[in-house]
Amino acid sequence: HLSIRRQRQMCIRDSSNEAEWHTFKNNKNNEAFIDRVYIVKVPYCLRVTEEMQIYEKLLRNSSLRDAHCAPDTLHMLAQFSTLTRLKEPENSSIYSKMRVYDGENLKDVDPHAKSMQEYHDMAGVDEGMNGLSTRFAFKILSKVFNYDHSEVAANPVHLIHVLEQRIDQEQFPQERQEQYRRFIKEYLVPRYVEFIGKEIQTAYLESYSEYGQNIFDRYVTYADFWIQDQEFRDPDTGEIFDRQALNEDLEKIEKPAGISNPKDFRNEVVNFVLRARANNHGKNPSWLSYQKLRDVIEKKMFSNTEDLLPVISFNAKGSEDDQRKHNNFVQRMVSRGYTEKQVRLLSEWYLRVRKAQ
């Protein structure tokens, strides 16, 4: 009788970093074992959203789970980590590539952005096998939480400082050091200036709602008289504005928003307000009711750093009204996810950056 003996087969799964694997592979004593190894290369995470989710999970299971983390901190770290893992594309920004990988559609934002498949094809099969690990990133995050000895909390400004320090300390090759610094300077910092600016702007404008309404009412009045080619007499001061003077004042409001066709814009605004008055007992609507003009007014109110100081800065206030507006601003920022100490740090950082620009 022919006896068939069936052997039981076993599969052992293990994971290793690329460097350790090459050390093991280059050892001739392991040749027989290596012949029985099937390699599955698993790249680092290349999607910012998923990288953030990893950090959130790690934080939930750590002693930092109850520590305060300011908005955009994890997002900034995830962006930096992801950028270090991507291959630089040709004729396109690596930052745009990162955003496309994360599922964003940049058709109307960046004409040089390519499709995800095009980026994949250009990068080759080993994209994501190099760059900073999630473990390294979490060590960075831990240092950020402990950057300020008086408050266990993390924020993007401290994250930038820690990243810059670590880049110098790690002694990366010169080319990689320069690349990582470029990521911070060209992508992370400008994007965060925009982000924190919008955060501050929202809290600031809520403290100046009456001021916004005054600008709205004045703009509508001036635009209406300008369209009709009539002089306007200020009822409070008696000052007379001819069409040229009206145009100059309207342009002061429009200029920060870059209105390219003021004639059409003014007609559009006045027509909207006239229709709205019919349903509002003849009164102007809220300055928040018409998004296009609201955007213009917000840019006007936020265009001069000096105008922000009474509300945003933490210096002694010249009046009780300024102090009240400042307190309201701080509380609104706290409600958006910041500690009071972070509000001061980030506001002062933002004002310095704005002043330097």
Q: What is the predicted function of each stretch?
A:
Residues K41, L46-A137:
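Conserved AAA+ ATPase small/helical "lid" subdomain
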Residues N26-P43:
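A short helix-turn-beta junction within AAA+ P-loop NTPase domains corresponding to the substrate/partner-engaging
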Residues I12, V37, L77:
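Conserved RecA-like P-loop NTPase ATPase core
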Residues L2-I4, R8, I12:
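Single conserved hydrophobic/aromatic residue that forms the stacking wall/gate
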Residues T134, S142-N146:
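Intrinsically disordered, low-complexity regions enriched in Pro/Ser/Thr/Gly and acidic residues
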Residues Y147-Q357:
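Terminal-proximal interaction/regulatory segments of ATP-powered molecular machines
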Residues R13-K25, P43-L46:
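A short beta-strand-to-loop transition that corresponds to the Sensor-1 phosphate-sensing loop
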